[in-house]
Design a protein with these regions (language model features):
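N-terminal active-site segment of His-dependent metallophosphoesterases
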Residues: 66-71, 78-83, 90-96, 105-113, ...
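A short C-terminal boundary segment appended to hydrolase-like catalytic domains
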Residues: 47-54, 408, 433, 440-467
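Aromatic sugar-binding surface patches on proteins
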Residues: 119-128
């Protein structure tokens, strides 16, 4: 006879068996004493098939890891009389130097590392080198040397690949002895077809200085976009920038995008030594000589008020324009600028309304969405008294995507030329003959400044005039 304890154990055993059996039957869709069980999941899950964990993407800062390094064509930037910036694209982690000399044989050549003092920077997308101590109006030959890091797990295990020596190019520094012409393009907006038309023209005509007068970009959300636009554009004539010194003038679109504040990583600003300590932050303004011409760069900034909700409290352009006025006042009194026979100022947004504007030629309107608003008027009010006193004869602008030439008028003794944009005879899907990409050239002939507007879409001269 079983003890009470044994009877309880048997009951517990039978109860557990019933539960487990019922669960198994339910899993198999069988009928139990409690009736047919349907759609009941078993508490005992079937083993899941083994799935290998996803591999993390390779960290580009760990090295190229056997992938061949692609090296782009160099781009001359921030041209000056005694310095030159050189930037080029790379497809992976690399270091770079520039070798240069005042002769094509590279006799007594100089090698310059990227960066300044201390540790030379390395990068996965762009290398930047600044040549300093150059002679004004002098021709130099140069080439890039780029070396990939095949592995960079840490400083003790880093490995270098074979150096890649670039093609030899040449450039001439700015200065009074450089008798080259200037060329201006604007509002390219990353539109490659019209950009190629301008690049091809520049490559064939070889100006002494290119002014890229704003709106090179649209909205820049990452570094790759900036590298493509400034260093590695997908056009046949991209190598024009390797031998034509360029100075960049910011447009309103060149301030848009979550990444754009880091543009210095792709586009070299002016050297700190080229501006006094009072204007340390004015890294895009410049005043240089190109023969008998003084070339001055000003930044009109964004095309909306600082308080506009689209800026989310980030805009600080109104104080920026005032600071530039103080800089301009000093720049135009520098002996090499003041003594220039012709003084040309470049800015993106026009400082004066179009002739068909209802307020032309007085520009008294404060806000005009059709042509320009008070931000441009603000620049005019701040800068024009200085420009008039200094004898500025020509302002070259963009922004409007339509070529025009404004003659001098009372209170404004300078001509204003506005370059065309990227449109090819169309505007918002409709034919518009006034929309065409331009290259604006300026050259001194027989003691006169000759300005020519080239329509590179129809391969014609839109206008030529003399000052």
């Amino acid at each position: 006879m079983r003890s009470a304890h044994e009877v309880l154990d048997m009951k517990e055993f039978n109860r557990r068996g019933f539960i487990l059996g019922g669960a198994a039957a339910a899993a198999a869709g069988c009928t139990t004493a409690g009736g047919k069980v349907e759609n009941v999941s078993s508490p005992v899950q079937a083993a899941k098939p083994f799935v290998e964990p996803k591999q993390k993407p390779l960290d580009p800062y760990k090295g190229t890891r056997g992938v061949p390094l692609k090296v782009g064509t160099p781009c001359l930037q921030s041209a000056a009389s005694t310095s030159m910036g050189i930037s080029w694209s790379v497809s992976g982690l690399a270091k770079g130097v520039v070798e240069y000399a005042d002769n094509p044989q590279f006799l007594n050549s100089v090698t310059v590392k990227s960066g300044g003092f201390g540790l030379a920077p390395i990068d996965i997308s762009a290398i930047q080198v600044r040549l300093t101590g150059l002679k004004p109006a002098t021709r130099y030959w140069y080439r890039t040397v780029t070396t990939p890091f095949t592995d960079y797990s840490n400083i003790y295990n880093a490995k270098l690949g074979e150096p890649i020596v670039g093609k030899t190019y040449s450039f001439s520094t700015l200065g009074e002895g450089n008798r080259g012409k200037f060329a201006m393009i604007c509002d390219t907006h990353g539109q490659w077809k019209s950009y190629e038309m301008r690049a091809k023209f520049l490559k064939e005509n070889k100006p002494g200085l290119l002014l890229w007068n704003g709106d090179a970009t649209n909205t820049t959300q990452d570094k790759a976009t900036a590298v493509e636009i400034f260093l590695d554009p997908p056009i046949p004539s991209a190598d024009f920038a390797a031998e034509i010194p360029m100075s960049f003038v910011s447009g309103n679109h060149d301030y848009r995008g979550s990444w754009i504040s880091k543009i210095n990583e792709v586009l070299l600003p002016r050297l700190p030594s080229e501006r006094s300590s009072d204007f340390w932050d004015l890294k895009w303004n410049f005043a240089e000589r190109l023969g008998d011409m003084a070339i001055i760069g000003m930044d009109t900034g964004e095309d909306k008020p600082d308080a506009h909700p689209k800026w989310f409290g980030l805009a600080n352009f109104e104080p920026y324009r005032k600071a530039q006025a103080k800089w301009l006042e000093q720049a135009v009194t520098r002996p090499e600028i003041a003594s220039a026979k012709f003084k040309v100022l470049f800015c993106h947004i026009p400082l004066y309304a179009a002739p068909d504007h209802p307020d032309y030629p007085h520009d008294g309107v404060k806000v005009d969405p059709q042509d320009y608003a008070y931000w441009s008027r603000e620049c005019f009010d701040l800068w024009n008294p200085i420009m008039e006193k200094a004898g500025i004869q020509l302002v070259v602008a963009g922004h409007k995507h339509r070529y025009r030439h404004d003659l001098p008028s009372p209170g404004r003794r300078w001509h204003q030329v506005v370059g065309g944009g990227h449109e090819l005879g169309m505007s918002r899907g409709k034919p518009d003959a006034g929309r065409f990409p331009t290259v604006i050239e300026g050259v001194i002939k027989d003691g006169r400044l000759v300005v020519t507007a080239h329509d590179v879409f129809k391969n014609r001269i839109a206008e030529t005039f003399m000052i």
